């Protein structure tokens, strides 16, 4: 029987590609996509749009019952105010779960991060808090997907920002100074294929899927890979000094990164390429 789905973050770089993959299947009769700020440009009669703000009280009475599945991509990934992470990623996720549960939904897919740990700064802590609270609901199926650093969408954050810097200016930062600096770059094509497949074959019970790229890279290893591909010059960057400069900049109103960015970079991750449940095929 085809499912009625509620999909948040469907206009994001990752969510939009997973949505397109899902639309190739006949398993979904309706996909209700949440509209908040970015317009959704999808031409398919099964796609409906609903206005929703996760930071405000809402219900889902505009969606017919039952809602068979919620896919929750929407999140705040970079914020100058740490509380904003919790308003969206934690409290907003709980609101969504409560509203969906009230409309008969018993299957939930939550896109989390391998930085969902207590020492990862406000972003990781907010995602971990959401995970823990989702586990308290009576779901038939709860799938939590903890992904590593996804690249290849042409975005302006994370690995994509380093790729853009190396391609355009032929320089790349070589981060060192902490044993916690480790990347497991996951290509967006691998992410989409694995996530769409996991959604289609969602098993009963609470399941946490650790999803990483095929290799673990240190800061220097990542820099040399970018240097080789784009003929870029690796520029050594000692992380403690960089963190000090960023903090000093924030004191005078210069916010070049989110305050928790360094903590997120060096925190202990929930998994690595060596121990993930699912591994991408495309090497960085």
Annotate each predicted stretch with a short phrase:
Residues 197-257, 281-284:
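Mid/C-terminal beta-alpha module of Rossmann-like enzyme folds, strongest
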Residues 5-25:
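N-terminal Rossmann NAD(P)H-binding glycine-rich loop of SDR-like oxidoreductase domains
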Residues 118-122, 145-161, 181-182:
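Flexible, glycine-rich beta-alpha linker
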Residues 48-91, 95, 99-101, 113-118:
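NAD(P)H-binding glycine-rich loop region in Rossmannoid oxidoreductase-like domains
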Residues 164-186, 190, 194-198, 210:
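A conserved pocket-lining segment of Rossmann-fold NAD(P)-dependent short-chain dehydrogenase/reductase
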Residues 91-129, 136-137, 142-143:
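Conserved Rossmann-fold NAD(P)-dependent oxidoreductase catalytic core, especially the SDR/UDP-sugar
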Residues 8, 34, 70-74, 108-114, ...:
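SDR active-site strand-loop-helix element
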């Amino acid at each position: 029987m085809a499912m009625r789905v509620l999909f948040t973050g469907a206009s994001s770089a990752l969510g939009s590609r997973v949505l397109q993959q899902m639309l190739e299947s006949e398993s979904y009769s309706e996909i209700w996509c949440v509209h908040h700020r970015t317009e959704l440009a999808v031409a398919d009669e099964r796609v409906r749009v609903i206005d929703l703000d996760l930071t405000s009280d809402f219900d889902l009475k505009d969606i017919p019952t039952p809602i068979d599945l919620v896919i929750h991509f929407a999140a705040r990934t970079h914020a100058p105010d740490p509380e904003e992470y919790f308003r969206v990623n934690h409290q907003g996720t709980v609101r969504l779960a409560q509203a969906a549960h009230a409309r008969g939904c018993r299957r939930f897919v939550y896109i989390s991060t391998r930085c969902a740990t207590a020492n990862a700064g406000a972003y990781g802590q907010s995602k971990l808090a959401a995970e823990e609270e989702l586990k308290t609901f009576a779901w038939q199926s709860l799938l939590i997907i903890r992904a590593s650093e996804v690249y290849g969408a042409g975005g302006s954050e994370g690995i994509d920002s380093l790729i853009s810097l190396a391609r355009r200016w032929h320089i790349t930062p070589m981060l060192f100074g902490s044993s916690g600096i480790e990347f497991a770059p996951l290509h967006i094509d691998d992410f989409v294929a694995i996530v769409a497949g996991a959604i289609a074959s969602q098993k009963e019970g609470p399941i946490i899927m650790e999803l990483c790229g095929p290799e673990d890279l240190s800061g220097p290893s990542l820099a040399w890979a970018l240097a080789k591909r784009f003929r870029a010059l690796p520029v050594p960057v000692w992380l403690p000094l960089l963190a000090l400069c960023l903090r000093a900049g924030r004191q005078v109103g210069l916010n070049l990164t989110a305050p928790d960015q360094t903590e997120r970079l060096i925190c202990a991750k929930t998994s690595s390429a060596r121990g993930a449940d699912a591994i991408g095929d495309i090497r960085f």
